[in-house]
């Protein structure tokens, strides 16, 4: 894992672009998986007693596991992108002697 605190502002901006690209692609895959989940729910809703049981059953599928993994990665990326944004702001203010 890279230490973002040692990156220059241009390196941080480039890293942020790469993360944003990954975030976008993961979001596209998430949409596909959510559509699959809707089809799964439609197919198996009558065979389970509750929505929670249906959700647990979905989470045991490969696609359900992938969706959970993507959700966790997206949340992590949101925090990292926010940290990079803050770090860029601090570095820019330091460059202007405003800190």
Regions found by a protein language model. Name each.
Residues 1-20:
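Short, charge-rich amphipathic alpha-helices with coiled-coil/heptad character
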Residues 2-7, 93-99:
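Terminal, compositionally biased segments
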Residues 34, 69-98:
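Long amphipathic alpha-helical coiled-coil segments
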Residues 28-57:
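Extended alpha-helical coiled-coil "stalk/arm" regions
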Residues 48-73:
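Short, glycine/alanine-rich amphipathic alpha-helical segment
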């Amino acid at each position: 894992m890279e230490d973002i605190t040692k990156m220059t502002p241009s390196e941080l901006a480039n890293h942020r672009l790469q993360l944003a690209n990954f975030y976008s692609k993961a979001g596209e895959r998430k949409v596909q998986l959510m559509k699959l989940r809707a089809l799964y729910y439609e197919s198996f809703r009558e065979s389970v007693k509750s929505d929670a049981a249906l959700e647990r059953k979905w989470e045991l599928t490969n696609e359900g596991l992938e969706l959970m993994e993507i959700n966790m990665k997206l949340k992590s990326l949101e925090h990292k992108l926010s940290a990079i944004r803050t770090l860029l702001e601090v570095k820019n203010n330091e460059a202007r002697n405003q800190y």
